[in-house]
Amino acid sequence: MIFLRLTTLVLLFAMVVVSNRAQPHGEGKQEPSAEVRSQLFKQVLADFRDLRECIEQEEGGARAAQENMSVEALDVNHDGVAEYEVQMSGGCACGMVNCSIYIYRKTAQGFESILDDASGLGVEVLKTSSNGYSDLLVEARDTAATRAETTYKFDGKQYREAKATIVHVETGERKPASRRLQFARGTSSTTVTGRVSIALPDTFLLGARAGQVMTVKLSAPRKSVRFLVMSPTTRNLVADNAREWTGTLPETGDYYIIVDADERNSTYSMTISIK
């Protein structure tokens, strides 16, 4: 899931309410039977090999993981038949706070996953819907100062990430977790402006090919404003505190350009070009 990668990038760089909610986590949901819990646990392990292999190495193994698994029934397609929110716990499925979240629906063959790339504190079912299924909101801890809110919409087969936002916990200020840069037709550069802090950076995505040359020029009234360029495999390409950088791109894919500052909000202007 792209937001997970972006969260990792922002944390690396730091080291170098919500409308339309209908059903908060845990409210209006039913506890499934022991048989359903067992079937869902087996299905999760069958679907996610890395998780299964990790759990097998943990103290207590699969039995402890199943006991600690959270399963709640909900009806996201309003047909009177339950779907199930499954949240694993422990080091194999969780970071410091956020844990992997899955949603399964019943089929003639058993259970199939319709959401398998979410991580957070739980699922909220929204009033809005897509293709007959309620939209979902997953809230996650991002940093000590911010939380992440990711909206998922059903595309007819699976829930897909539709929007990701970071929110400052104290001020309520919010911004997109990332924005995609696009050049105007016939041009090879663009200029963006914004206001950032260490808690609320700006993250841009720019698709490029290996061998192209990227140039980034940053202008800001405060020296604390800085930028970082990360390759598609999250390799840092820029020296600390650089205000200008030119480099030949090593990979084909989406490059991440992150701008942040210190605790104070700071304005900036940045020009990016690719040749």
Predicted regions and their residues:
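Short consensus segments that form the blades of beta-propeller domains
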Residues: 61-62, 90-96, 141-143, 217-218
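Acidic, Ser/Thr/Pro-rich low-complexity intrinsically disordered segments
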Residues: 196-260
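Extracellular beta-rich ligand/substrate-recognition surface
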Residues: 58-66, 191-200, 237-238
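Non-catalytic extracellular/lumenal accessory regions of secreted precursors
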Residues: 173-205, 211, 275
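Edge beta-strands of jelly-roll/beta-sandwich modules across compartments, strongly enriched
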Residues: 202, 263-275
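Acidic/hydrophobic-patterned starts of short beta strands in beta-sheet-rich repeat architectures
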Residues: 77-89, 130-140
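Acidic, small-residue rich beta-repeat scaffolds with periodic aromatic anchors
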Residues: 5-8, 12, 21-53, 125-177, ...
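Short beta-strand-plus-loop segments that form exposed binding edges in beta-rich domains
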Residues: 140-143, 258-264
